[in-house]
Amino acid sequence: MERKLLDLGEVQIEYFVHGSGPLVVLLPSLGRGAEDFDDVRPPLAHACCVVTPQPRGIGASRGPMSGITLHDYARDVAALIEREGGGPALICGHAFGNFVARTTATDRPDLVRGVALLGATHVWPVPPDVRESIMKSSDLSLADDERLKYLRHAFFAPASDPRVWLSGWHPEVKKAQRVATDATPQSEWWQAGTAPILDVQPESDVMCPPESQSRYRDELGDRVTIVRIPNAGHALLPEQPAAVARALLDFAARLYPAT
C-alpha cells in the first residue's frame, strides 16, 4: 500500500493506494477516517486499485472546514480521481460518505462509473432518538459505558460488539461535515447523477427499516441494485467486512466487464 499526498493549494488530501485494476474510491462515515476500511480494502485490492482518502481534518488532510458544502468535499474526491488517471471510478461511500459519493457523481459524471451506498440512510428525517445516539456516541466527554449504549442503538446489530467504535472519532470533523450537509440542498446530490447504484443494506440498520428498504429503487428505478447483509447495523464495516468486499467486487465486475 502506498501513501500519497494531493496538493490542491489550500487543500491537501492524504490518501492510500492499494492494488491495481479499475479505480475504486472508499469514503468513510461521519467523523471517521480511512482506517474504517482496513478490513475491506485488502480483498478488493486483489482485483481493483483501491483508493482510501482521509477526509479534511484527519491525518495529513487539511482544508477549509467552515463555509463549505458537500460540493467542496466532492471536489476533493474528483481531484483525487483525476490524479489517479481519471477513472471512471466506482465510488463507495459509507453512511455520510455516500452523500459525498453521490455529490461527486452528480457534479462530475465523467469521472464516475458507479456509486455504492454502504449503510445509506433510508429514512428522512432521521428519528430524533437515533440522531441523538449518533451525536452522543462520539462525545468523548461521556463515559464509555454511556457511549456504548448510544453506539448499540444507532450503529450495531444486537450480536455485534460496539466497543470497536469507541475510538476512531474526530468530533470537529464530524461537526464540519454535518454543517456542510445541512448547507447543501438534498436535491443537488440525492440522485447521484445517472450512475448505476449499489445499495448495500445492513439488515439491522435502524436507518433502513423494512418499510424503507426499496426507497431508492422505487425512486431511481433499475439503476439501483439492492444487496442485504445480515448480522450488521449502520456501522457495517467492522461487523461484516468480507460481505461488504464481496458485494463491491460483484458490482465492480458488472461495471468493468472487460477487466
Residues covered by each model-derived region:
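Active-site loop/oxyanion-hole signature of alpha/beta-hydrolase fold enzymes
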Residues: 39-42, 51-92, 246
